[in-house]
Swiss-Prot record:
GO cellular component term, pick one: cytoplasm
PANTHER family linked: NH 3 /GLUTAMINE-DEPENDENT NAD + SYNTHETASE (PTHR23090), NH(3)-DEPENDENT NAD(+) SYNTHETASE (PTHR23090:SF7)
Primary enzyme class: ligase
Substrates-to-products reaction catalysed: deamido-NAD(+) + NH4(+) + ATP = AMP + diphosphate + NAD(+) + H(+)
EC number per UniProt: 6.3.1.5
UniProt pathway: Cofactor biosynthesis; NAD(+) biosynthesis; NAD(+) from deamido-NAD(+) (ammonia route): step 1/1
Protein name (record): NH(3)-dependent NAD(+) synthetase
Recorded name of the encoding gene: nadE
Pfam families associated with the record: NAD_synthase
A molecular function GO annotation: glutaminase activity
Protein residues bound to ATP: 45-52, 158, 187, 209
Positions contributing to deamido-NAD(+) binding: 138, 171, 178, 258-259
Length: 272
């Protein structure tokens, strides 16, 4: 088995999918997990990008079906901007498409700013922009878990195969969640699900961005990764890619293994 094949198997990626069936399976997963845990619904941060739009719509469909079955469940969508978000119109368009039961908005700027100021006061040095970006992601996670805990809701994560293979998420930030309905999907497969669901086209054709850096606002994921999502998706779907692309993806995959595992202990073998 090649490393490419091993990665495909580990991340549960299929070379091709049928969007309608995938939607049904993933909504079914959300419903089954909620019933198993006894929780009362879901919470998810909505950015206006492809991944949270898709996960949010799946969550809303799941709770609506549960209510039709006589099980009370709700979905809370939460906006978590850092000050004024440049693509706020997209976030509002995503909420209009998702139609969540409830939506809240928390501006995380003051919380992040207070921490950054305290960090500089205590250590004598400014928090680097990259690490401040990770603080933003983790404050968003804390907010979602506060809402979830207060309302007995499960926190949904938006991680998918293209992020998992590259480790392109913040550990205990956007990587902190209770369940992941997009697992196994490549970026283009996620787009096909949104097309099937009738999402506004601009929400899945826009350039994806984590938008965590003050110094590089709206920097695209592809610029930060040095790889295109088409390259990553081709690799994950078992297609031929250049040796340079394969090496870059595999290097990131190996370096980010710790992000796909629970914290290491001396009894684990994965890190050896």
């Amino acid at each position: 088995m090649t490393l490419q094949e091993k990665i495909m198997q580990e991340l549960n990626v299929k070379p091709s999918i049928e969007p309608k069936q995938e939607i049904e399976k993933r909504v079914g997963f959300l419903k089954s997990y909620l019933k198993k845990t006894g929780a009362k619904g879901f919470v998810l941060g909505i950015s206006g990008g492809q991944d949270s739009t898709l996960a949010g719509r799946l969550a809303q469909l799941a709770v609506e079906e549960l209510r039709e079955e006589g099980i009370q469940a709700e979905f809370i969508a939460v906006r978590l901007p850092y000050g004024v978000q440049q693509d706020e119109d997209d976030a509002q368009l995503a909420l209009k498409f998702i139609q969540p039961d409830k939506s809240f908005a928390f501006d995380i700027a003051s919380t992040v700013g207070s921490f950054a100021a305290q960090y500089q006061s205590v250590t004598g040095e400014a928090l680097a922009d990259f690490h401040k970006g990770n603080v933003k992601a983790r404050v968003r996670m804390i907010t979602q878990y506060a809402i979830g805990g207060q309302n007995q809701l499960l926190v949904i994560g938006t991680d998918h195969a293209a992020e998992a293979v590259t480790g392109f998420f913040t550990k205990y930030g956007d990587g902190g969640a209770d369940l992941l309905p997009l697992t196994g999907l490549t970026k283009r497969q996620g787009r096909s699900l949104l097309e099937e669901l009738g999402a506004p086209e601009r929400l899945y054709t826009k350039s994806p961005t984590a938008d965590l850096l003050d110094e590089k606002p709206q920097q695209s994921d592809e610029t930060e990764l040095g790889l295109t999502y088409d390259n990553i998706d081709d690799y994950l779907e078992g297609k031929a890619v250049s040796s340079e692309v394969a090496e870059a993806i595999e290097k990131r995959y190996k370096a980010s293994e710790h992000k796909r595992q629970v914290p290491a202990s001396m009894f684990d073998d994965w890190w050896k």
